[in-house]
Swiss-Prot record:
Belongs to the class-I aminoacyl-tRNA synthetase family. Glutamate--tRNA ligase type 1 subfamily. Its EC number is 6.1.1.17. PROSITE patterns: AA_TRNA_LIGASE_I. A motif ('HIGH' region) lies at residues 18-28. This is Glutamate--tRNA ligase 2. Keywords: Aminoacyl-tRNA synthetase, ATP-binding, Cytoplasm, Ligase, Nucleotide-binding, Protein biosynthesis. The gene is gltX2. It comes from Fervidobacterium nodosum (strain ATCC 35602 / DSM 5306 / Rt17-B1). CDD domains: GluRS_core. HAMAP family: Glu_tRNA_synth_type1 (MF_00022).
Length: 467
């Protein structure tokens, strides 16, 4: 075996190996994160490998989407299909000759055999042989499972795990189309890419005995395994589309910050001393044994709360940068002034909410909420509040927060009305809704021209709604 590496390098090498059959799931992103943290903590290498042997479902578009999402999350790799490395190729579809060579070697050693199938019935085996078939019939390479053998390994998280081969059947390692099956390819790849630690979801535990049999047959040192508990939905079943969005791309479009999403994924099962943090500052604190051995539930509300905390720790310049980048996902693109962002950020938890919250400041064709119309605009005093507001704001030239507050309180006093009724009537008139940033700050930001034109517009609305 000319390519064989006889001893594992002392350098820690981990890999994230997605199948490019769709989007990057938050469960996959968390697995990538734990691998990334482990590599960085140990000054090792984080490898991206694309497992694209499912020829019917794998696409380069999905591969690119996954890489884009990982980059957006900040989980950059040291070796991979786009940047290369010393252990490539990093796509399984480009490693077929390697798989064939070592599958045939297993046959030569007596650990596997060729299964030849009926030409008209691809499931019917007509011959098993250790000689390479010269027939036109389809054939596979099948690994021979030893009888009544106990297979064991020490999981970094779960401790000793044992399996028996008593109920295991021989399994295909090389398909008739020349492509490898998962359990075989992953062993070949992890060995020749010198992977030292395999951190993956616990749904892979059932794959481990087949992989260990292959390591033993080749006489190769196996990596250390850690199987991470799964992310569940609220009903305690594995997280899926049934529970809501699961794609990293969805959360990106919904206006979540990358560091906030990574922060939340990190605390899903990792016991740390604080809930809000920058994951890049937690590298030295990462210890696999601190990961919970229990499945964890994905809480969408908690994620939104974490995101809001991150949004409020950003400088205004940083928030504006993220906000402008996020606007590529919007149909209406407006230049939102910094001052509007500044007075709005405390009331929202996502960039999308920030956009929706600030839109009335720049979109003069804003709609009035039903709440505002029913609770305030249809009331008989609304016209008096708005007409007096027009007069007083017309007389005001210096739109400071203090002056705006003074005008609004004068309206309440002169009309002998409660401040809430006056404030909410004016708030809805200038912004179309009842939940906004501070009213005094909002009018100060809008300025004289916009404030007056919006009150005038609302007065015109009253006759059309029967107020």
């Amino acid at each position: 075996m000319s390519q064989e590496i006889n001893q594992k390098s002392q350098e820690v090498r981990v890999r994230f190996a997605p199948s490019p059959t769709g989007y990057l799931h938050v469960g996959g992103a968390r697995t990538a994160l734990f691998n990334w943290l482990f590599a960085r903590k140990n000054n090792g290498k984080f490898v991206l490998r694309i497992e694209d042997t499912d020829t019917e479902r794998s696409t380069r578009e999905s591969e690119q989407m996954i890489m884009n999402d990982l980059k957006w999350l900040g989980l950059y790799w040291d070796e991979g299909p786009d940047i290369g490395g010393n252990y490539g190729p990093y796509r399984q579809s480009e490693r077929l000759e390697i798989y064939k060579k070592y599958a045939y070697e297993l046959v030569e050693k007596g650990y596997a055999y060729f299964a030849i199938y009926d030409e008209n019935d691809p499931k019917k085996v007509i011959e098993k042989t250790t000689k390479e078939p010269k027939t036109k019939n389809p054939f596979t390479v099948v690994f021979k499972v030893p009888e009544n053998k106990v297979i064991a390994f020490d999981d970094m998280l779960k401790g000793r795990i044992e399996f028996s081969t008593e109920h295991m059947e021989d399994f295909i390692i090389l398909k008739s189309n020349g492509y490898s099956v998962y359990n075989y390819a992953v062993v070949i790849d992890d060995h020749f890419m010198n992977i030292t630690h395999v951190l993956r979801g616990e749904d892979h535990i059932s794959n481990t005995p087949k992989q260990l049999l292959l390591y033993e047959a080749f006489g190769w040192e196996q990596p250390k395994f850690m199987h991470i508990p799964l992310i569940l939905g609220a009903d305690k079943t594995p997280l899926s589309k049934r529970h809501g969005a699961t794609a990293v791309e969805h959360f990106r479009k919904e206006g979540y910050l990358p560091k906030a999403l990574v922060n939340y994924l990190a605390i899903l099962g990792w016991s740390v001393d604080e809930e809000i943090f920058d994951y890049t500052q937690k590298v030295q604190s990462f210890m696999p044994e601190q990961i919970s051995n229990k499945n964890v539930v994905f809480d969408y509300q908690k994620l939104e709360w974490v995101n809001g905390k991150h949004m409020r720790t950003l400088s205004l310049d940083e928030l504006m940068k993220y906000f402008k980048e996020w606007q590529e996902f919007t149909e209406k693109k407006f230049e939102i002034p910094e001052k509007v962002i500044e007075i709005s950020r405390e009331k929202v938890n996502t960039l999308k909410q920030l956009y929706e919250f600030t839109l009335p400041f720049v979109d003069d064709n804003y709609e009035y909420s039903n709440d505002y119309i029913e609770k305030f605009l249809k009331k008989p005093e609304a016209i008096h509040i708005l007409e007096l507001g027009m007069k007083k704001f017309s007389d005001l030239n210096d739109y400071t927060i203090e002056n705006v507050e003074k005008v609004l309180r004068e309206i309440a006093i002169e009309l002998n009305l409660g401040t809430n009724k006056v404030f909410q009537t004016i708030r809805g008139a200038v912004l179309g809704r009842l939940v906004t940033p501070g009213l005094f700050e909002s009018i100060a930001v809008l300025g004289k021209e916009k404030t007056l034109s919006r009150i005038r517009r609302t007065i015109g609305m009253i006759s059309t709604i029967g107020g």
